[in-house]
Amino acid sequence: MSAVLLFILFFQDWLVQKPKMMRWIRHGFLVYTLFFIGWYALGQLSIVNVLTFVNSLISGFKWETFLIDPIMFVLWAVVAGIVLLWGRAVYCGWLCPFGALQELINEIARKLKVPQYTVPFAWHERLWAIKYIILLVLFGISLESMATAERMAEVEPFKTAITLHFDRTWPFVTYAVLLLVVNIFTRKVYCRYLCPLGAALALPTKLRVFDWLKRRKECGNPCRLCDKECEVQAIHPDGHINYMECHYCLDCQMTYFDDHKCPPLIVKRRGKRRGHNAPGHPEEIPVVQVN
């Protein structure tokens, strides 16, 4: 499946111009991530893995520690390469089993017309800082006691929902289920605001090699369609993409290439019909209703 993901990434500009096929591919990949990588292979990464790695660098690195579980070792190797090339977005959006579970549940909720709540951007900007605070607290605790840090890392519902298939005592199950219930009404609340693993993977994102998500000069002003549609609110009102919060779902890229949906392209298409190629003035950009 690594080859499939690389194909998606390298040919994303072609795939996003076929929205129906792209959505089927994405949903199919998420099902694979949840059922095979997560529930079957138990390949759910955890902040505990990151803390163990950092502590091993401090106390004396030993390969044997990380070769005990080959699946986790291979997955971490793949994720490390992906983070260096594309940032954390690809892991969070495509390879995290709990993230896949949340997204699939939210997709089903939307199909059933469950009302969705959008967190005001001013609040969103402040709430996503919580996961970095959790990361710092866990890191500080791990320097004193790795065992204590591992217990505190139960802020992650991964062990309950993925590794143990919800077969735990009721407090852990209640916590995991509560996060999934909230996710029915607003997508990936845990990922956006509480996940210390996502925070840890976001730190090296600024060093990524590739920057393949396209934007237009009209993005943010006057057009704000993509930031209104972005389910994880990774696109700021000024139009730029915050890669430290992006999950690389490629929805904004499907809009970018769609001349029946992207307002600047709509204006350009109408201009061609009138016999000229000018993209039109910003004030001509049509208003698009966002549901």
Give a label for each model feature:
Residues 1-237, 244, 251-291:
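Non-ligating segments of multi-cofactor redox enzymes
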